[in-house]
């Protein structure tokens, strides 16, 4: 009985929170009356989210179309945005932290929206609203994924600054994939992880570059491009593809004719179910994936 009473109380609190904080705009979105599903047109999303922005208070409304686009203009419905809040007492603090973060990112005006570049941080949020993060050069990112990176904690702005530094380290044409961004959790260990991974995935030598044409192990190191960040992302993505798939698929994908293409090397060690990646690479990947926060 106590459990049901607590559950009913919790649900009531969530409903009251939604009603008070987000207003009628969100309530109608949650009940489906606005037609604002995840795949609804941007114009419908925009209208509803602007109403939601006004209901959420002057902080959010002051951001205008940019603030609304962060939630729905590029594919995020108000209902989905609301689900990011769990109904806890900390929700209002999360809301304030996110508003402050958006204000900092938007400090340079509208230049970032138009060009995806702007000045400094502006390009990051401007491009976010348009469907990509200019902050992370070349590594197109879904707005929902980008928004979820920030959890409303005090460390959000530190995460932003660290990721900006890492993106700069990758170089203008380096690119940063979603796989790489997922590695970064905002902890103090992030820079150490980056430095260590960069050493392991050091730029290929002349001999390695030449070997690429022959499809040798050394030559495969250059498949991911010259950027350490891109190679890190490729390492994780390829490992996932080749090692975490069902055996039937793995046999086709990683046969002796189509060896498992790891970002570090190409292996031709044939086992019972086909080809697998070299032990050296498996060790390297496991070493980093087992690090705290990785």
UniProtKB/Swiss-Prot annotation:
Main location: secreted
GO cellular component: extracellular region
Keyword terms, alphabetized: Secreted, Signal
Region of interest called Disordered, as start-end residue ranges on this chain: 205-225
Compartments in which it is found: Secreted
Tissue specificity statement from the Swiss-Prot or TrEMBL entry: Nacreous layer of shell (at protein level). Expressed primarily in the mantle with highest level in the mantle pallium and lower level in the mantle edge.
Domain of life: Eukaryota
Protein name from the UniProt record: Glycine-rich protein 2
Species of provenance: Pinctada maxima (Silver-lipped pearl oyster)
Organism phylogeny: Eukaryota, Metazoa, Spiralia, Lophotrochozoa, Mollusca
């Amino acid at each position: 009985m106590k459990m049901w009473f607590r559950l009913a109380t919790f649900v009531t609190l969530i409903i009251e929170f939604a009603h008070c904080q987000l207003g009628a705009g969100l309530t109608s979105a949650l009940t489906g009356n606005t037609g604002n599903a995840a795949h609804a047109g941007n114009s419908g999303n925009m209208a509803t989210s602007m109403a939601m922005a006004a209901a959420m208070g002057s902080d959010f409304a002051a951001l205008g179309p940019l603030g609304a686009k962060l939630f729905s203009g590029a594919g995020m419905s108000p209902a989905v945005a609301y689900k990011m809040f769990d109904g806890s007492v900390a929700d209002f603090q999360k809301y304030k932290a996110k508003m402050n973060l958006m204000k900092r990112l938007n400090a340079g005006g509208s230049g970032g929206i138009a060009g995806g570049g702007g000045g400094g941080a502006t390009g990051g949020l401007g491009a976010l609203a348009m469907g990509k993060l200019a902050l992370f050069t070349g590594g197109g990112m879904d707005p929902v994924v980008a928004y979820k990176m920030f959890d409303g904690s005090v460390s959000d702005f530190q995460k932003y600054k660290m990721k900006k530094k890492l993106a700069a380290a990758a170089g203008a044409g380096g690119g940063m994939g979603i796989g790489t961004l997922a590695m970064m959790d905002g902890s103090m260990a992030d820079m150490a992880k980056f430095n260590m991974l960069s050493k392991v995935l050091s730029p290929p030598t002349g001999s390695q570059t030449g070997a690429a044409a022959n499809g040798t192990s050394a030559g495969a190191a250059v498949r991911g491009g010259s950027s350490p960040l891109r190679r890190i992302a490729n390492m994780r993505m390829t490992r996932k593809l080749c090692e975490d798939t069902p055996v039937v698929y793995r046999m086709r994908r990683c046969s002796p004719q189509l060896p498992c293409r790891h970002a570090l090397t190409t292996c031709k060690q044939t086992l019972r179910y086909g080809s697998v990646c070299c032990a050296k690479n498996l060790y390297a990947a496991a070493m980093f994936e087992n690090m705290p926060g990785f």
